[in-house]
Amino acid sequence: RFRKAAALGLAALMAVGSVNFAGVTTGAAGLPTTDGHDKYVNKNVFDVISSDTFGTKELESPLFDKTKGSSDITDLQVPTLAYDESSIGLVWQKPEKYDNVADYNVYINGKLAGTARENYKVNAAWAAKYMESFYDYYTTQGNSDVDMVNVDIHAYRATGLQPDTEYTFKVVAIDKDGKELGTPQEIKQKTTAKAEVLNIKDFGAVETEGYTSYDDEKNAIIEKNTKAIQAAIDACPEGGKVVIPENTDGKVFVSGAVWLKSDMTLEVNGTLWASPNSDHFEIGFLMYPFYTDTRGWGLVNAMTSDESNPIKNVRVTGTGTLYGNGWKYGAGSTMYGDGLTSNKGKNTQAGDPTDTETWGLPRYMGGGNVNVFYQGIQSKDSAYKYLKNTGKYDDAKIESLRTATTAAEATAAANGISKDDLKFAYATRSSLLIMRNCENVYVGDITIENPSNHSVNILDSRNIATTNVKVFSYDGNNGDGLGYGCSQNVICWGNFTDTGDD
């Protein structure tokens, strides 16, 4: 299933591109080597194979040798906006010689603060837990000959820091015995001043249950919340922070689309729940200029059409959730109960963590041009309204789509509707976080769950950092995880995605 590749691949590649095949022993890296890779990879030197137009051919000599060269780390940096008033994030590249690298020591102001691996378990907990469970299973219970890669962690987050204070960091590789390798590399970074905080409750936002249907009363509350959150954003001073506070008694903040501006942080500590009414998400978003299907904008957006004046310096952070309200719970075409009760942890597979209460994953129905009419929530509403607004079909036909509760009812209701109309209706589904033409973006720690369409779209932007973002969208149709279309200078590390698509 895709989530296995995502959990491991994102955790590794997002640690600034560090994946080494069978190059670190179990004792050194804390992760296994496998006999499976010995068939293809020399333990000492990679035999790199290059493809050309006519097939494959072996190079005359290896492109690199992990047993030679400098033991110094390289490219130590603080990614874009990966710092605030109390924390600073670091990333780096592994040394040229890395055959004996097991971990990295990190010093703060001359004192050893810890290692990259231990820090990763705290600051990228989902990626770390699924990596640990995966490797544990396939080296003890599963097929030990399965091809796996060793993952080197090239990141560290310092927390509990003081505002408006400069810190000096040094990072150095260590071997399995803790011996330092090479010369420590140094970087300085200052935390920000303490930000002015604007709580959306102070602007009139109210907590309710998570709506999966709507009427006039619910619409009024949703529109009140949307206006309150937008008012807080509009009032936010430069460098300020708009906070969606933690919820109480399982309640959430239900909202329509909101729009961020330059020089601000949106800190989501509670749940921002997307309205089930698709009218609260303006139609007009084109994924790419050459697309013809017009979609709804996201729950949270940062966008300008003025390419010479991009949205700048935007952070989206917090311990909470952007919840898309897109699909009912289920597996494929089989609904879980009424489709509205969470099935978190009910669909485990070999290699998943055994503690499903903490680490269990939800699963959503698969979707499709016709299935959306009984499997969808917000996704159903947008498709239904598109067809209604075409004016091509009588009210009874449209109403039968809205009230379909089974595959048979949806199929019967869709009979007589053109395939093109069904396709374009389905395409109107909105996403969760959309950023376009932005410069200097940081997205960290939040959970993105159950989008109608895509999870995160960062498009036509530059200088982007994402870390410890959890995406739960499996097996909803599309449900893309972290998307960076036509963007530059992107650094991702420690993210976890369980997606039904990219």
What are these regions (language model features)?
Residues 4, 31-502:
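Extracellular/periplasmic carbohydrate-active domains that bind, remodel
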Residues 16-35:
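Sec-dependent signal peptide cleavage junction
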Residues 10, 14-18, 266:
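Hydrophobic core
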Residues 1-9:
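Bacterial Sec-dependent N-terminal signal peptides
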